[in-house]
Amino acid sequence: MTEAKTPRRRNLLKGAAVAAGAISAPMIAKAQTGPISMRWQSTWPAKDIFHEYALDYAKKVNDMTGGDLKIEVLPAGAVVPAFGLLEAVSKGTLDGGHGVLGYHYGKQNALALWNSGPAFGMDANMILAWHKYGGGAELLAKLYASIGGNVQSFLYGPMSTQPLGWFKKPITKSSDFKGLKFRTNGLAIDLFTAMGAAVNALP
């Protein structure tokens, strides 16, 4: 990132709670000379639809600023692994990130409240409303601070609860989950682990 006389930066994490998009970018404290360049990374592969969302966002920002702000969005793994994005943005290794808040579940499990969880509780639009009008944004800032997250999160792009899954054998009773290899994230990790599933928390 090109900077002139910017001794201190604060990184913003633009996150997609309950959704699939978290974007991070630093706020510049003083005036810049020339275009500002930012390097972001997503938690998604290059061909993933959610990575395309991040690219679309960056293009809109670039166009709106008339080229004064140039955001480059890299795919997952280009600089850090998907689950290393929060730390990379906090430390300034990257200027921004696009992912899902639930991916930080291992650092602070309460962050899963903003993720698409099991099939009960608030839906995605309810979570966004709670975040904006019900104190969710303030709670999120405290949770990030509790794990040393030097980021500011912006939520967008609601996603409904993830489908249960696609299985080789029919699931007809709860005991069928015992020993079953199952991919999920957020609060669903604890739920299906308690049911005996072998859960993988993959991006």
Where are these regions (language model features)?
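Extracytoplasmic "Venus flytrap"
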Residues: 39-56, 76-80
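N-terminal export signals
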Residues: 11-31
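Contiguous mixed-secondary-structure segments that line small-molecule binding/active-site clefts
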Residues: 2-3, 59, 90, 100-202
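Immediate post-signal peptide segment of exported/extracytoplasmic ligand-binding proteins
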Residues: 25-42, 63-70, 170-181
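Short, polar/charged alpha-helical segment
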Residues: 47-72, 190
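N-terminal secretory signal peptides
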Residues: 1-7, 20-22
